Amino acid sequence: MNRAPITALLLSVLCVPQLWSAESTRQILTPKPPAEARVNGPTIYGARPGHQFIYRIPCTGERPVRFAAQGLPASLHLDPLTGIITGHAPDKTGTYAVTLQASNSNGRSSRLFRIVVGDTLALTPPMGWNDWYSYYEQVTDKVMRQAADRMISSGMADFGYQYVNVDGGWQVNTNGKDPEVGGEPRDPQGNIRPNRRFPDMQALAAYIHNKGLKAGLYTSPGPVDCADSTGSYQHEEADARTFAAWGFDFLKYDWCSYTTVAPAKPTLADMRKPYDLMGGILKKQDRDIVFNLCQYGMGDVWTWGADAGGNAWRTTGDLGMTKDDRLPAFYNIGITNAALSSYAGPGHWNDPDYLLIGNVGDAFKWEQSQERLPTSLTPDEQYSYVSMWSLMAAPLFFAGDMTALDDFTLGLLCNSEVIDVDQDALGWQARVIRRSPDELILEKPLEDGSVAVGLFNLTGSSRKMTASLTDLGLSGGQKLRDLWRQKEIGEVTGSFSHEVTRHGVILVRFSPMRIGR
């Protein structure tokens, strides 16, 4: 094949109007998964020696599917019918290379899965669901169980979503207004109590685990959380032991009322103190608990969050409380987060907040109304949102109503090629190639030598955007693939251009062409 520059040819391929834009309708770009069994999910996974291990192999395809795992350590057991791996991580540190296999009547597939036993968890960004922007303080045990059920039945778990996380609202509320959530916050021994909406936290975690999923919890280092429910101040050791005994696998630690016990003008040491404390305590537990620091980016947390034991840290304030007249909030939050790429990597991730798509509540009115309405974001804005989070190796936590999932939202959440960008084992956050008031270009190197690139139009009208291979640090001929449609587009040398809709995105993957094919 002639390898001469083919920019003009590529442009003629790219300029199919419906290829990128979903603005006029809620066009589902993600293809339906094929009928044959296909193993999805990360290719690397961190665990601590001897700790309890649970992992559900993400797999699409027509059921029933039969699973196998070559090279699985002897301390672990795979259920061949459910694909759930349980047991305990090996006592010996090191990397255990496992080949995950899945087969059904339509075909089979396999995927390398490296279990790295050591001190680092979350070697890829955590994925799951958090209730806050849907239920706020009205969350219940029933809501969490339904969410776990829906994570399986919707197919989200088949693409790697695994954490089912309850935010604030499970604890006893200290303001005493509602007897259902009021009462004594701790038992006579000082152990934290859930409110009456959560009759048995250990049973809830077990319910989630029985599906092969993981359970997440929330508290504050202050006396109370942001809605006056019990915090962990001066009970850090006891609470960490309780959370581990209940069986929780993830802890979000929200600054909230810690302001009332910190100095009026806190130093960096003051800001670090509660997170250093809890991070050290969690490491002493006999359970793997991913630690999520939520203190809104104060004190440049990205420079010290990993040293405090954090696996992810919020880089800004709440996305749901951010407003802007020009751009949707996710753009402003994302652009801030994008500048911090050098601080992210395996086991420690910049967290720009949750995916507020689907049906969500109003963060400004949550105390007055529990109504959950469809997001006001346009379809193109939603594609931009998920594309940006994936390029930035952000934790992917859906925060919409799990009971109101529709096909369009599932298409956004469950595109295996887009998720692979987020979960890539190299663990690089995309770097900013170009940033202006009108456009943003992000580039993320991937483990196989390819690069994922997002071209984001920040203006209120369509505009032509161009990226050259020189801009991207690439050379020679490159194959170009549309990640949302999961289709090869063509080949390019030099540069490529395309008209991008308002607030829209082009998300592509460049791979070196092989000479002599």
Where are these regions (language model features)?
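Solvent-exposed, low-complexity, repeat-rich "mucin-like" stalks and linkers
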Residues: A37-E62
